[in-house]
């Protein structure tokens, strides 16, 4: 089960896509297919990783891997995302848990 909010890491893209809730996921999942490649994955607020698989060619279905991203690896992803969003002081970006990092990604998107 996904702990919302979450972010999607698209293969080959340094930006993270924020998904705020299960309702938002259901509403936007079809449009996310446009960007989908085989190695895309979702990271939930607990750090669990879900592979994204096609179902019926028009739905992405998150499949739990049982793996969790480390806090340091997630900080690195958020710093890269911030760098591509032309944020300054990316070296200072830090947070205590994955949920705080996902909230930070959301706030970066709100500033655009």
Question: Locations of the language-model features?
Answer:
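Short, flexible N-terminal segments of the mature chain
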Residues: 15-44
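Short, extreme N-terminal segment that most often corresponds to the first beta-strand
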Residues: 1-21
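Low-complexity intrinsically disordered segments
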Residues: 36-112
